[in-house]
């Protein structure tokens, strides 16, 4: 049996409540479900989740801030499990195995933190990545990184405000265009240090 199409949304350890709250809106959950997402995992960091009542009821969040439930857009009828055409939705504050979480995902929506981005881009085969810079940060370095990676064709970029517009091409078209990020060449660093120190 093939595993369910899984979308990971991650903000690392930062606060990005506008993104995490947005992807957990009933309208956005229904959109994802209509686009074929069968499992949504939202890693939301230190933020306080602001959820609408029907989503809060579905997720049954525990004292650690983790929760799981099944979302369905069946005219408000609740479902017991994903076999009834529901989308599994899981929320977690943090994970001890981010690489493993990425490895189990078919696509990732991420804040533009360099650690999160590089973890996704270094996976082979490439995993489609939609980067949402947190423009509320003072120096807006996330936008610079996201724009540079977009220009080189490694990621798609969206804002929280245009996420609905971008998510369909991201899930339907981008997977065939995702390309592998170049492997880190550790010997280059050694060569630069040797050259600076005058070693031959």
From Swiss-Prot:
EC class name:
transferase
Q: Which Pfam families match?
A: Glyco_tran_28_C
One GO biological process term is: dolichol-linked oligosaccharide biosynthetic process
Keyword Cell inner membrane (UniProt): no
Q: Molecular function (GO) terms listed?
A: N-acetylglucosaminyldiphosphodolichol N-acetylglucosaminyltransferase activity
| Keywords of this entry | Endoplasmic reticulum, Glycosyltransferase, Transferase
Would you tell me the Gene Ontology cellular component terms?
Answer: endoplasmic reticulum
Q: Which InterPro entries match?
A: Alg13-like, Glyco_trans_28_C
Q: According to its UniProt record, where is this protein mainly located?
A: endoplasmic reticulum
- EC number(s): the record gives 2.4.1.141
**Subcellular location, in the record's words?**
Endoplasmic reticulum
**Catalytic reaction(s) noted:** an N-acetyl-alpha-D-glucosaminyl-diphospho-di-trans,poly-cis-dolichol + UDP-N-acetyl-alpha-D-glucosamine = an N,N'-diacetylchitobiosyl-diphospho-di-trans,poly-cis-dolichol + UDP + H(+)
Function description? Involved in protein N-glycosylation. Essential for the second step of the dolichol-linked oligosaccharide pathway.
Subunit structure as annotated in this protein's UniProt entry: Heterodimer with ALG14 to form a functional enzyme.
Q: Which family does it belong to?
A: Belongs to the glycosyltransferase 28 family.
Any idea what this protein is called? UDP-N-acetylglucosamine transferase subunit ALG13
* Source organism of the structure: Cryptococcus neoformans var. neoformans serotype D (strain JEC21 / ATCC MYA-565)
């Amino acid at each position: 049996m093939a595993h369910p199409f899984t979308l990971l949304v991650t903000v690392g350890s930062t606060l990005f409540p506008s993104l995490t709250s947005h992807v957990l809106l009933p309208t956005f959950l229904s959109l994802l479900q209509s686009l074929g997402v069968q499992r949504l995992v939202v890693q939301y960091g230190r933020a306080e989740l602001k959820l609408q009542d029907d989503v809060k009821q579905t997720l049954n969040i525990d004292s650690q801030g983790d929760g799981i439930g099944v979302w369905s857009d069946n005219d408000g009828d609740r479902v017991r499990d994903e076999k009834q055409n529901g989308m599994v939705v899981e929320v977690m504050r943090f994970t001890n195995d981010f690489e493993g979480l990425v490895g189990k995902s078919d696509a990732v929506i991420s804040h533009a933190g360099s650690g999160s981005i590089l973890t996704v881009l270094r996976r082979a085969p490439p995993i489609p990545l939609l980067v949402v810079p947190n423009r509320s940060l003072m120096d807006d370095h996330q936008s610079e990184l996201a724009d540079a990676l977009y220009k080189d064709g490694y990621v798609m970029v969206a804002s929280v405000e245009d996420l609905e517009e971008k998510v369909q091409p991201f899930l339907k078209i981008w997977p065939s265009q995702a390309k592998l990020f170049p492997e880190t060449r550790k010997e280059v660093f050694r060569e630069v240090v040797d050259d600076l120190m005058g070693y031959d």
